Each structure stands twice: as C-alpha cells, then as structure tokens.
Amino acid sequence: MKVAISGGGTGGHVYPALAFIRELKKLHPEAEFLYIGTEKGLEADIVKREGIPFESIEITGFKRSLSLENVKTIMRFLSGAKKSKQILRDFKPDVVIGTGGYVCGPVVYAAAKLKIPTLIHEQNSVAGLTNKFLSRYTDKVAICFEEVSDSFASEKIVFTGNPRASEVVGVESEGALEAYGLESGKPTVLVFGGSRGARGVNEAVEAILPEWNKRDFQLLYVTGDVHYEKIKDTLADLNLGSHISVQPFIYDMPKILNAVTLVVSRAGATTLAELTALGVPSILIPSPYVTANHQENNARALEKNNAAIVITEAELKNTDLMATVDSILTDEEKLNAMKASAKQMGRPEAAAKLVEAVLGIMK
C-alpha cells in the first residue's frame, strides 16, 4: 500500500497527518508513505525528523482581496499541480490525503485529475479556502466540527474528529509536573499561547501574577520562545512562589495535558482536539489573527457545550482573568461539569476513524 499525504504551513495541518500515518502503520506496517509539502512550512522540519520521505513544491496562498499577487499565486498553483502530477506518477500512490494548508491544493487537485482516490481533512469549524475548492474534486471530506458540514456536499462528509486526539489519550503523566518544578496531585493551570507564544495572552497573565502568587493552585506558564527572556526579566522582582513555573516551551505536551486541571490557551483545532479527548476544561482566548476568525468559531463550539469559557482578545483588557480562573477551580461542581462536557465532545478514536474512511475510498 502506498499513501501520499500533503498538508502544511502550521502544526495544525501537519500533526494530524502524522497521527494518521502512525495509526495506519499499526494496521499496515508494510505501507509506504510520501509527504508532499513546501520547504518553507513547518512540515519541512517536522516530517523530515520523523524519517518520512519528503518532496516539496512551491505554492503561496490567495489574498482575500483583489491583488496582482493572486495572479502569481495562480501561476504557482498551475506549476505546483504539474510538479505534483509528476511526483504522483513516480510514486504511484493508492490514495492521496490532504490535511489543509495551501500546499495540499495543487497536490490533491493533481491526484483527482489522475483518478487517484482522494480525501481531505478539515480540522476547523470554518472551512479553509483550499479545502472548499478541493471538495469539488475529492471522494470524501473528513470533518471535526458539525458546524462546518454546510460548507461541503453532504454525501462526501464523514465525521472523524482530529486524529491528533488519539495521541494524547492514555499517555503516562507520572513525573510530568515535577519536571517543571511543580508538585503532582495539586490543582494546576497550564497557560500557553502556541509554540511561539501569544503577546495578548502573555500580557494578561503577567498582569495577574501578583494575585496568583497568593493562590494555592499551581501555574505552569509557557511564554513561547520569542517572549521568554523579556518576560523573565520583567518577573524577576515579583519573587514568585515555587507553585508558579515559567517556561519558554513544553516539549512533552501530551504528558502535561494529562496532568493539569485547567488550560488557558488559544483555540487552534489541534489544541481543542487534545483537550476534549482528555476532558480538560479550558479558558480559550482565540487568536484574532487567523483566517475567517476560525479560532473563535472553534472556541464557541466548546463554549456552547459548556466545555470552555471564551474570552476574546479584545475583551481581555476588561476581563478579570484571575476571577475567571477562580470561578472554575473553587467550584468543584462547575469544574466537574466542564470536564464531563469536554470529554463528551472528545473523539479519542479519531485516528482510527480517519484510517477507516481512507481505506473505504480505496475499495
């Protein structure tokens, strides 16, 4: 069995692809994989480190306004589709999967034109431009949020969830908090704004640290590499207690997520898949800098089901974040209700469901 996968730009498109690959390997250890991405995207680094064969094409995204740059993008798309056809003819895959991002546009389009079975995976509650375009040509569209189903033909939709969810379930959490100077068994809040951090989130947390210093519950505050040194200098005079740990980055996130009580974070699709798979309540601060405001839409889906509290970045300045954290951690009934609601939304079987959908179009 040969499988070609394309998706990239951000981890939200790459990590689901890798989770799918690992799941399929369990059923078909003999399967061969080829990942098609760009050299500039995150996938070039992550996929190569996984030891998966990698080919690259050049592509950029469309501007949402009239622009001469879009003419260049069309030319790059056509060139990328031509190169993709050649790569696919050489590799001869049995199926081609797109997990989002601009790069999968020419790849999946080329596969469909070559009559190779195709499936795209939409992680968000708002369909991306690339997936909307590709859905006209693909055999199936795998989704994670019911809210996005109106964007695609109903006969093509299969609800799988995000395969990344399957990778955090059952992970051993022993020693996870101790590795960052915290105690296991104590209520702990994890705050993070993505791999690079988020300035708005950081500013809100910095403002409440003097108050947090008086609380009993622990804080694992992940600033992001870019902001760490500056924040570390700012906090030097606060004399923070040992129950507050400030870190630039977390490399063992699945372990940590299994050990914490509450998460304060952005609302990327992969993060939400992980939180709901584990039943972790959250305070979500969606990034306002993403296409079609999809993070807020993702977050509202959890809020509607009582699995999260949503605070937009615009609301942060007038919101007492400390009081919001207190309202959850000091109310056991509320905390447990949010846990149960998050768990109910989770799709820990998502990777297996996606594999099933892919194998189904190969028959």
From Swiss-Prot:
Annotated SUPFAM superfamilies: UDP-Glycosyltransferase/glycogen phosphorylase
Enzymatic reactions: di-trans,octa-cis-undecaprenyl diphospho-N-acetyl-alpha-D-muramoyl-L-alanyl-D-glutamyl-meso-2,6-diaminopimeloyl-D-alanyl-D-alanine + UDP-N-acetyl-alpha-D-glucosamine = di-trans,octa-cis-undecaprenyl diphospho-[N-acetyl-alpha-D-glucosaminyl-(1->4)]-N-acetyl-alpha-D-muramoyl-L-alanyl-D-glutamyl-meso-2,6-diaminopimeloyl-D-alanyl-D-alanine + UDP + H(+)
Keywords of the record: Cell cycle, Cell division, Cell membrane, Cell shape, Cell wall biogenesis/degradation, Glycosyltransferase, Membrane, Peptidoglycan synthesis, Transferase
The EC number(s) this enzyme carries: 2.4.1.227
A Pfam family the protein falls into: Glyco_transf_28
Main location: membrane
Localization (cell): Cell membrane
Gene Ontology MF terms in the entry: UDP-N-acetyl-D-glucosamine:N-acetylmuramoyl-L-alanyl-D-glutamyl-meso-2,6-diaminopimelyl-D-alanyl-D-alanine-diphosphoundecaprenol 4-beta-N-acetylglucosaminlytransferase activity; undecaprenyldiphospho-muramoylpentapeptide beta-N-acetylglucosaminyltransferase activity
Keyword Magnesium part of the UniProt annotation: no
InterPro entries reported in the protein's UniProt record: GlcNAc_MurG, Glyco_trans_28_C, GlycoTrans_28_N
Pathways involved: Cell wall biogenesis; peptidoglycan biosynthesis
One of the protein's GO biological processes: regulation of cell shape
A cellular component annotation (GO) from this entry: plasma membrane
Disulphide bridges: none
Membrane topology: Peripheral membrane protein
Binding site for UDP-N-acetyl-alpha-D-glucosamine: 10-12, 124, 195, 250, 295
Family matches, as PANTHER family: GLYCOSYLTRANSFERASE, UDP-N-ACETYLGLUCOSAMINE--N-ACETYLMURAMYL-(PENTAPEPTIDE) PYROPHOSPHORYL-UNDECAPRENOL N-ACETYLGLUCOSAMINE TRANSFERASE 1
Task of the protein: Cell wall formation. Catalyzes the transfer of a GlcNAc subunit on undecaprenyl-pyrophosphoryl-MurNAc-pentapeptide (lipid intermediate I) to form undecaprenyl-pyrophosphoryl-MurNAc-(pentapeptide)GlcNAc (lipid intermediate II).
HAMAP family assigned to the protein according to its UniProt record, in alphabetical order: MurG
Family: Belongs to the glycosyltransferase 28 family. MurG subfamily.
Name of this chain's protein: UDP-N-acetylglucosamine--N-acetylmuramyl-(pentapeptide) pyrophosphoryl-undecaprenol N-acetylglucosamine transferase
Gene source species: Listeria welshimeri serovar 6b (strain ATCC 35897 / DSM 20650 / CCUG 15529 / CIP 8149 / NCTC 11857 / SLCC 5334 / V8)
Gene name per UniProt: murG
